[in-house]
Amino acid sequence: MPRKGPVPKREVLPDPVYNSVKVAKLINKVMWDGKKSLAQKICYGAFDIIREKTGRDPLEVFEEALNNVMPVLEVRPRRVGGATYQVPMEVRPERRLSLGIRWIVEYARQRSGKSMMEKLAAEIIDAANNTGGSVKKKEDTHRMAEANKAFAHYRW
């Protein structure tokens, strides 16, 4: 932990095409080795594929996918008298967004074959339809929180 007080939050500027902070965060999450222009090509290409496949505004589909993936509850470890309990807690809004984007990109990367554009587009469409790996991850997280509800009184 920092000794000089809280670390200030970095301001993420909205992306140039959709003027959305969420899309900018998606681009930053897709980016590897600082290659932002390549990450932008991948994300905007994926959004074009989404427009072709669904016939809807890709930003709407992405927002819907994020809402289906963002977790409300998660478990956090808490040591009490030599035992570690998984304590269910609510997820802060900033963390919800970052987890949602992280899971979408992570499960898009795990898909087999094809280019990253197609994999990302497929994962976003699946998440918008409440299917896919990222939605399953959210459900697993919620299931863990539900299973450990007995330890909810250990919240801090």
Curated annotation (Swiss-Prot):
Q: Which UniProt keywords apply?
A: Ribonucleoprotein, Ribosomal protein, RNA-binding, rRNA-binding, tRNA-binding
List the molecular function annotations (GO) for this entry.
rRNA binding; structural constituent of ribosome; tRNA binding
Q: Which GO terms describe its cellular component?
A: small ribosomal subunit
* Any GO BP annotation: translation
What InterPro entries does UniProt report for this protein, alphabetically?
Ribosomal_uS7, Ribosomal_uS7_bac/org-type, Ribosomal_uS7_dom, Ribosomal_uS7_dom_sf
Alphabetized Gene3D superfamilies for the sequence: Ribosomal protein S7 domain
Give the superkingdom in one word: Bacteria
The keyword Acyltransferase is assigned to this record: no
Family designation:
Belongs to the universal ribosomal protein uS7 family.
Q: How does it assemble?
A: Part of the 30S ribosomal subunit. Contacts proteins S9 and S11.
Role summary: One of the primary rRNA binding proteins, it binds directly to 16S rRNA where it nucleates assembly of the head domain of the 30S subunit. Is located at the subunit interface close to the decoding center, probably blocks exit of the E-site tRNA.
Q: Do you know which NCBIfam families this protein is assigned to? A: rpsG_bact
Indicate what this protein is called per its UniProt record.
Answer: Small ribosomal subunit protein uS7
Query: Which species is this UniProt entry from?
Result: Caldanaerobacter subterraneus subsp. tengcongensis (strain DSM 15242 / JCM 11007 / NBRC 100824 / MB4) (Thermoanaerobacter tengcongensis)
